[in-house]
Amino acid sequence: KKDGVLWIVGGPRPSTESSRLDSLGARHLPSAGHLDQATSEHSPAEGYLLGDTLCCGLPRKIVATNIPQSFIDQFSWPPVEIHDGILPDRFADFAAAQAPGGFDDIIVLDPTPEILDALPPVLAPGAVVNLVGERPLGRPVRVDAGRVHYDYVVYVGTRGPDISASYGETGNRAEIRPGGAAWVIGGGGPMGRMHLQRMLEMQDGPRRILVSESNLVRNPEITADFGPLAAERGIELAVLNPRQMPPHAYEAAVADFRGAGGFDDIIVIVANVTAIESAMPHLAPDGMLQIFGGLGRGTMAQLDLSNVYLGHAQITGSAGSTIRDQGAVLDKVFISQLSTAAAVAAIGGIDAARDGMQGLMDGRFPGKMVIYPQVESFPLTALADLRSAAPTVYDLLGPRGAWTREAEAEFLRRFAGHVYE
């Protein structure tokens, strides 16, 4: 991050008698020659290259811990502050002293489980954690799923030696993989259906989509509402209900659908740590796991992040769209590349707003509820129930009962006295 604080941390290194310790237990090495002597026997991060890591802007501060001088010498500016000997149990105190708001970027060379377990509390909002190494972790580590979702914390990685391979558009992506396999966990609700609609209408989207949904009402609606569109686009669509299958059978069905290569994209809509943890083993070597479910900050998931650097996988999240993103969505709607109306499940007037909020919390409808403030009095009504509540509006619904511009115009004409062109 430009003008941010970058921390580069490696595995443990031996101390020397001539080094001095500060109040945090950090070892300050007075010279490059001394540092080379201290690390000549054991340099876990030896051989890595900086590459184009700083091509997009310089951090205002760079801190290094347990990193060989040969790597530090690749930085020309700003000067690297060396603080060796910081153990994971002191990371929080170290971050408070060096980056009170958290580190904007952390590069971990040859990561260990102990190092990664200690990282969540020291990350700034929007932090990027770049893992670089060739040895698997051997066990899951702590990942703050809530901060990945709400604070846009990202985990990327590479085997090396060029650590910049983790960055940029070629190093990590922000879009569904064309022609790949995608898995939407919790795909029967409003947000899941929007993800599904978008993937099915993408010009170059996935060729195979698996949807998991445990709601007995929503589950069959997925196939009914999206099956025809998937067939039209030549996309394989399958729906599983984990509550209707023994755990081992469900896992086997997921594995059978994904095949040997794994899922290129896994989007976890449900706010459930177990769903995130169980999804990780099904991720392709260079796949992307997106945490979309609204888990609170501090909610820890246990994930084996070895695949992040050994296979170039990504862990990312989103809590919603920026204004710019919303503009991009509208552009797709205007050129008929995205049918947002298909997500509408119920409508109501302004007096139904409270009922709509309660319906949202109760999961009453599988799709979105639209409240029209210019309509003073109309109860929250499922589109299917417009047959009796507003027959002339119902008659203008689209295929499979989808909301349409014509139906909206008739609704406003009848109940708001508004002519909508």
Predicted regions and their residues:
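Rossmann-fold NAD(P)-binding glycine/threonine-rich loop
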Residues: D117, G133-Y152, E277, G293-H312
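A short helix->loop->beta-strand "cap" motif at the edges of active sites that frequently abuts
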Residues: G4, L58-R60, A124-V128, D151-V153, ...
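Residues in the short beta-alpha loop(s) of Rossmann-like NAD(P)-binding domains
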Residues: P12, T65-P68, R135, S212-V217, ...
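Short beta-strand "acidic-cap" motif of Rossmann-like dinucleotide-binding folds
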Residues: K61-A64, L131, R208-S212, I291
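Conserved beta-strand segments of alpha/beta enzyme cores
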Residues: E81, V154, R208, E236-A238, ...
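Glycine/serine-rich phosphate-binding loop and adjoining beta1-alpha1 elements at the start
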Residues: K1-D3, I8, A124-G180
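C-terminal hydrophobic helical "lid"/dimerization subdomain
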Residues: K1, S18-G57, N66, S70-P78, ...
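ADP-ribose/adenylate-binding Rossmann-like module
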Residues: D105-D110, L123-P140, D265-V270, P281-M300, ...
